[in-house]
Amino acid sequence: MVEGRVSEFLKKLGFSGGGRQYQALEKDEEEALIDEQSELKAIEKEKKVTALPPKEACKCQKEDLARAFCVDLHTGLSEFSVTQRRLAHGWNEFVADNSEPVWKKYLDQFKNPLILLLLGSALVSVLTKEYEDAVSIATAVLVVVTVAFIQEYRSEKSLEELTKLVPPECNCLREGKLQHLLARELVPGDVVSLSIGDRIPADIRLTEVTDLLVDESSFTGEAEPCSKTDSPLTGGGDLTTLSNIVFMGTLVQYGRGQGVVIGTGESSQFGEVFKMMQAEETPKTPLQKSMDRLGKQLTLFSFGIIGLIMLIGWSQGKQLLSMFTIGVSLAVAAIPEGLPIVVMVTLVLGVLRMAKKRVIVKKLPIVETLGCCSVLCSDKTGTLTANEMTVTQLVTSDGLRAEVSGVGYDGQGTVCLLPSKEVIKEFSNVSVGKLVEAGCVANNAVIRKNAVMGQPTEGALMALAMKMDLSDIKNSYIRKKEIPFSSEQKWMAVKCSLKTEDQEDIYFMKGALEEVIRYCTMYNNGGIPLPLTPQQRSFCLQEEKRMGSLGLRVLALASGPELGRLTFLGLVGIIDPPRVGVKEAVQVLSESGVSVKMITGDALETALAIGRNIGLCNGKLQAMSGEEVDSVEKGELADRVGKVSVFFRTSPKHKLKIIKALQESGAIVAMTGDGVNDAVALKSADIGIAMGQTGTDVSKEAANMILVDDDFSAIMNAVEEGKGIFYNIKNFVRFQLSTSISALSLITLSTVFNLPSPLNAMQILWINIIMDGPPAQSLGVEPVDKDAFRQPPRSVRDTILSRALILKILMSAAIIISGTLFIFWKEMPEDRASTPRTTTMTFTCFVFFDLFNALTCRSQTKLIFEIGFLRNHMFLYSVLGSILGQLAVIYIPPLQRVFQTENLGALDLLFLTGLASSVFILSELLKLCEKYCCSPKRVQMHPEDV
């Protein structure tokens, strides 16, 4: 293309070639040619930009670093540069290559010892020229293996969906604007801004630092946070000693910083580790482990019975190969190898249902733990409340009061002096103006498109400044130093100087009144500093108490030349309104036996006001301060925390002590939070729940569960799902064990009494498909029963096989065995020989019993008419498919030969249906009896027996 344009250029200049006359190049064509050449040069330049190893980047001066990555540190990369670099370096992410071929996964199913035994049986049949038996057994093996493969493959695919969690995000400077991006979009040379709570999105060489501490424990194993600098280093040293480099995956624990991305994806140090990582198997959940134990116990029991059957049959002179084939087939059917798979699928499907409700569960064990949750501790700000902080009241240090209208971060509203209702703009009132100025300057938030980038409290102060036309005053100052806010000190301050005037530096401070006022010696009186008297201090404390009692978060503001000589400016009252639906959620959770507790850093009055607003307690609210938590003995604390609904003035260590005390008292504790100060408690709780939108990366990392939309009421759905899943698994266990016991008992009794086998090997394998296949699987996805949510939290010590469940299993098995033996005895000829009609009637009777049993196993407490026939569509399709399959086995000639069946009349089918329905009718009558005859109190006290 370029050669063509050059050729045209030469032609138009008059150079001849090949007898052709050239014309002059047009101006626009000349400009297009120059632009195209410039673009090609720019592309070549971008291609030369490569990731820089940390040991080289750490030695670079800022200017050299900017030159190496072709980036302006003040404006960042252009979109053109980003596009070209992404083509060269790819996305900032890792692609795991652990995909085992599907065919290999399918062949792995044949490693099951029982399957190998069946194949051995088929081989023996071939050697003895019993070809029909060999084909029948081989076909059955293929069907069983395929069903197992589909179940496992579906489970794996579902788990892959769970790994797509809330993606990490970052703040990046591009084309002169600070943008909020997904971390995967970063390229080498991007300028990234870091603040407290952020997860480092890539390897970054720092260029600006303000008291930056980074937790590199995930990278170095050292628990102590590392202090960072922006100065170049003289020596390379070990990676762990590079103080001006921050590595992907580590966490900002304190301070702020900015730097240039030097490595992304697999070019980062984390990527080097990733390349060497071996995929580890996902650990099994406690529920899965208990199901595995149950399965092993039943397997040993089944093998014992099967061995006895084979021994007795052989001693009675029956054909050894026939008895071996029946024994192995019975082992395949009776041993509940599907239990762990169904548990996994049920848990995964439950998690995916929760994901549709915008609740992300990071670890499967949490699903089962949710049903046991008895206490929910919640941070207040951003969790129970809306996280749209709004200033509603001002009180200046000289006693002036003002009210503020408007909600959120759009800057709409006014500041009116009371009682005159005079609207204040800029510095029309000096006392109010100075108060608002301090809140604006001691601030790291940015409001863009009516959304705050930063802390909501700081966003409220910026919105206040916007309402007074003072939002640009921050640009009048040069920030020299920042002392970031922490839960321990409860204040933050900045050291600044005016751009236009040569004056001494000035500090602006904001924070809790009791902490800020300690640094003050003066108070502002209409622009004139006066000594801060005890009377003035008392006035401020009274005002703080008054504002706090209204549910306002109160911030004190001050300014001055030194931290010990500040001038107190006044108080601002900020409301953080409760989220929509929180009050209703608290009420429903309380009714279901979950005690909700609020843990906040706010003052007592503020905490109590919010507690009452959201209905934490119907009577008098019990409250406890962080100081009390420290002073109370460990044993006494475990007794007291259960009665307290509100914890105030707490730090991260207090939250941790409260969680531990509740756990010591026997509670299963869930903790919700969104901030860095919640991270330790989130990790220590049995269930850590973070906010997806407002939550920091640290809190999301520590949590087991994420509310994507920050919707507190979604916790109700999660607890409901957790309880429902446990009951669904119990339903499945009841169905599968009653079928296993029935099949084993049927063959055992016929063998002991020297009768022909009521079921042949192929029929037993078909029953196995029903027992482990779609009808059984569909019980695991039964929609959650609303009554399950009203049940008290179950104890973690509750087992799947409760006393009541065992009795129901034995009752169902007894009915199935009795009914099937009745048909077998009724259809048996006088010579006791096994005929196709005998086995067909017995086989069909057992299958019909099985399907009616599955119908009643859909709920342990509710009648089928209460839960509805049509509610579980998967169950309907599964049962319909099983019925059609059974009819095919009976009436299609090729299948008749395989399963050794014959045609049955319509009256036969009606009779078998009526008889098989007895297991359903008797089970439903038992539910009815339990519902109206058992004491409601007893049912409530022992929900596991229901």
From Swiss-Prot:
Modified residues (Phosphothreonine): T264
Catalysis: reaction(s): Ca(2+)(in) + ATP + H2O = Ca(2+)(out) + ADP + phosphate + H(+); Mn(2+)(in) + ATP + H2O = Mn(2+)(out) + ADP + phosphate + H(+)
Principal location: Golgi
Record topological domains on the Cytoplasmic side: 1-106, 151-231, 315-331, 772-804, 856-874, 927-946
Binding site for Mg(2+): D674, D678
SMART domains: Cation_ATPase_N
Keywords for the protein's UniProt record, in alphabetical order: ATP-binding, Calcium, Calcium transport, Cell membrane, Golgi apparatus, Ion transport, Magnesium, Membrane, Metal-binding, Nucleotide-binding, Phosphoprotein, Translocase, Transmembrane, Transmembrane helix, Transport
UniProt subcellular location: Golgi apparatus, trans-Golgi network membrane; Cell membrane; Basolateral cell membrane
Organism: Homo sapiens
Protein's UniProt name: Calcium-transporting ATPase type 2C member 2
Topology class, membrane: Multi-pass membrane protein
Record carries keyword Ribosomal protein: no
SUPFAM superfamilies: Calcium ATPase, transduction domain A, Calcium ATPase, transmembrane domain M, HAD-like, Metal cation-transporting ATPase, ATP-binding domain N
Region of interest called Interaction with ORAI1, as start-end residue ranges on this chain: 71-95
NCBIfam families per the UniProt record, alphabetical: ATPase-IIA2_Ca (TIGR01522), ATPase_P-type (TIGR01494)
Protein's job: ATP-driven pump that supplies the Golgi apparatus with Ca(2+) and Mn(2+) ions, both essential cofactors for processing and trafficking of newly synthesized proteins in the secretory pathway. Within a catalytic cycle, acquires Ca(2+) or Mn(2+) ions on the cytoplasmic side of the membrane and delivers them to the lumenal side. The transfer of ions across the membrane is coupled to ATP hydrolysis and is associated with a transient phosphorylation that shifts the pump conformation from inward-facing to outward-facing state. Induces Ca(2+) influx independently of its ATP-driven pump function.
Quaternary assembly: Interacts (via N-terminus) with ORAI1 (via N- and C-termini); this interaction regulates Ca(2+) influx at the plasma membrane.
